[in-house]
UniProtKB/Swiss-Prot annotation:
Name of the protein described by the UniProt record: Actin cytoskeleton-regulatory complex protein END3
Species: Kluyveromyces lactis (strain ATCC 8585 / CBS 2359 / DSM 70799 / NBRC 1267 / NRRL Y-1140 / WM37)
GO molecular function terms attached to this record: actin binding; calcium ion binding
Domain EH, first and last residues per copy: 8-98, 142-234
Subcellular locations according to the entry: Cell membrane; Endosome membrane; Cytoplasm, Cytoskeleton, Actin patch
One term under GO cellular component: endosome membrane
Amino acid sequence: MPKLEQFEIKKYWQIFSGLKPVENKLTHDQVLPILFNSKLDTSILNKIWFLADIDDDDQLDFEEFVICMRMIFDMVNKNIDSVPDELPDWLIPGSKAELVKQRKTERSSGTAETSSVVNVPTSSPAVDDYQKEVDWYISRDDKSQYESIYESAITSRDNSVSYVSLSSAVRSKYINLSSQDLEKTWRLVNPKLDTSIDKDPALYFIHILRQVNDYACPIPSHLPSALKETFTKTRVSTDLSSKQSEVRRPTLSTSNSSSYQIPKRGGTDFSVTQGTDWEVVRLQRELANIDSELSSAQQQSTSHNDSNDRMKLVKQQLEQFLEYQKNLVNNSNTSSESVDVGGLRDDIESIEQQVQMLEEYLKTKKSELHNLKIEVQSLY
């Protein structure tokens, strides 16, 4: 596995700053789009997150973000076959070396305590083989305790909890748990492998892990049918990054989902980070569409202006002709036998009707022109 290069770190910094960190840290929700776009299995992503989050605060500073990104790239590009159980020395930041050592010590001590509980020496082989199974019943006192842990892990408005936040809260309460225990239990209570779960599966997640911690109970391989039916019910998600939200915002999810794609070339390919400013690209496209519509409206407005000018000229000519005909009638000294007065009146009435029709047509066109001007102004 090649070590970090300076150009990699610069590229990671561009991605990190583009995600708008708060106090130089990113939450799990901010990093979630990158994690999902990697197309890696949830269990792999969870393990990468745990390794990268050295200080266990459910956030990544830049050094931790570099660790997370590098391990994702190496898994995607198949530079490594699996996520290591511990960080390699060359990937550990100097400022966090002590924290890494402390974490290793805590895990090893927790494993030793668990082993001492499970492997109790006894003279009876039958007792050795016996392990207490998980009790699915939750008492009132236990439920109150679990709810307290659950509420401390809530990070979203719909009161659902993510794997990272809930696991961190459970670990702070029960220390004899391994990452494998947490991951296996999460998959058990989350059959649909959603990014977050509701209160009921969260309480059973805590309930199972408490018994694993206190009594070294083996994690069940399946749920009781009643619980499984409850946990697999479709939950309405309010998370904008979820698939349900794609129905409401197809432009964003379709045209911009490639901001972090799986590289096709061998080795660590950082070209996938290009195009992270997809919002700017989308706005530029919308601006180009608006400019096109504005240009079209202006052309229509110009054509209507030309048409109005022609209508004014025709009206003026007809009015002049009408005036000429009236003068002929008024100034004519010939007798009624020699002049067809009735025919002239018919001609005058016909011309007046035509002028009236043209005036109505002109009025209609002026109304259309006025509406077009309003549309043009609204586009600015």
